[in-house]
A protein has these predicted regions:
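Intrinsically disordered, low-complexity, mixed-charge
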Residues: 1-97
Length: 97
């Protein structure tokens, strides 16, 4: 889903070997390079959650990069959901909770 300006919001949950391999740092760097805002965090079950907002085409590029991941990561599955942007993020950050 995208608004009239082409902006969208992406929610992704990434499964596989994605913790302990600098995956969150990788997502932070990739999202910053693409000019996206949002957050990334580890989930207690070993998956990683990504919330990102920005240009729909840039978000689609992020999805491709999330599938690849950093060296040492092995993505086995990714669930994605598109919504209209909410504008709740000013930058991209790693949440440590």
């Amino acid at each position: 889903m995208a608004d009239q300006t082409g902006r969208a919001s992406l929610h992704a949950v990434v499964s596989g070997i994605v913790q302990g391999v600098f995956y969150r740092r990788f997502v932070l760097q990739e999202a910053a390079e693409l000019g996206l805002s949002g957050r990334v965090r580890n989930l207690f079950d070993g998956r990683v959650e990504v919330e990102a907002e920005g240009d729909r085409q840039k978000l689609e590029q992020l999805i491709k990069r999330l599938h690849k991941g950093p060296p040492g990561a092995q993505v086995t599955d990714m669930a994605t959901e598109w919504t209209d942007p909410r504008g709740e993020y000013k930058d991209f950050r790693v949440d440590y909770d």
